[in-house]
Amino acid sequence: MGTLMNENQVTKSMGKAFGLLAGEVALDSFAGGGGASTGIEQVLGCSVDIAINHNLDAIEMHKMNHPNAQHYCEDIWDVDPEEALLRSGGNSIGLAWWSPDCTHFSIAKGGTPVNQAIRGLAWVVIKWALRVPIRVNFLENVKEFRTWGPLLQDDNGDWRPDPDRKGETFKDFTKALTVGLSPRDPS
């Protein structure tokens, strides 16, 4: 029977099991005040290298909490992956953390209209994966993200999820990110 580890021992154990390799950097996209970056740093035992957010207040707070990161205060679609990697001093991304806006998927939004551009933010993961080497991607979102599908425009011009096509876009996104393998494929 194994022994139980306390939180600090688990974190140290995870950091030893998963660390950055030579030349790898860590990315926190959609970085807010730095909570995800703090967790990443606890596991890896080193600072996050690249942080991106379009909101100046969020980036200023992140800078205070994580001064060693290269900060980008701009639309994530406008950040050039190759340039960000070059400026960070790395040659690949060992860990990329993605937290695209969840409000346009969450059931907490109720029946209110949704924004296509915000719902499409997760596609930026594919852009980065096609442009720079990434060893491990983490994408955090609400469980309703799995229902991501096409939108229909109603009579008022508002966009709402097509109830007959739930999950279609999520499946396409997963295929694009995994070169078509099922997320449950053991290979």
Where does each model-flagged region fall?
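Conserved active-site and SAM-binding loop architecture
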Residues: M1-S187
